[in-house]
């Protein structure tokens, strides 16, 4: 279930402020953020965000296809390394 249309999309104020400052100065520096919950606005296109995944900051370059999604969708929090093969135990039986 999505967010109510009358509320509008959510973005943290400090994040929007940083993007606006860089757009005024025509800069494209990496913006470090912990705000995974912020919605990607059209103003964010072309910027790179370092989104925190709980362990490190993952660089996310924003393209036009990402508008409307959340920043956290592009920085996975879990890493699956695969199941361990326990062939030795199964062969003994």
From Swiss-Prot:
GO cellular component: cytoplasm; small ribosomal subunit
SUPFAM superfamilies cross-referenced by the UniProt entry: Ribosomal protein S19 (SSF54570)
The keyword Membrane appears for this protein: no
Alphabetic keyword roster: Ribonucleoprotein, Ribosomal protein, RNA-binding, rRNA-binding
Pfam families: Ribosomal_S19
Gene3D superfamilies: 30s Ribosomal Protein S19, Chain A
One term of GO molecular function: structural constituent of ribosome
Coiled-coil region list: none
GO biological process, one term: translation
InterPro entries: Ribosomal_uS19, Ribosomal_uS19_bac-type, Ribosomal_uS19_CS, Ribosomal_uS19_SF
UniProt key word rRNA processing: no
UniProt xrefs under HAMAP family: Ribosomal_uS19
Family: Belongs to the universal ribosomal protein uS19 family.
Protein task: Protein S19 forms a complex with S13 that binds strongly to the 16S ribosomal RNA.
Name recorded for this polypeptide: Small ribosomal subunit protein uS19
């Amino acid at each position: 279930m999505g967010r109510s249309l009358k509320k509008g999309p959510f973005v943290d104020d400090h994040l929007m402020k940083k993007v606006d400052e860089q757009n005024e100065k025509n800069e494209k520096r990496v913006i470090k953020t912990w705000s995974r919950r912020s919605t990607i606005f059209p103003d964010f296109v072309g910027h790179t965000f370092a989104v925190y995944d709980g362990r490190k900051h993952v660089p996310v370059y924003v393209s036009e296809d990402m508008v409307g999604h959340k920043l956290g969708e592009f920085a996975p929090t879990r890493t699956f390394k695969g199941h361990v093969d326990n062939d030795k135990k199964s062969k003994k039986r």
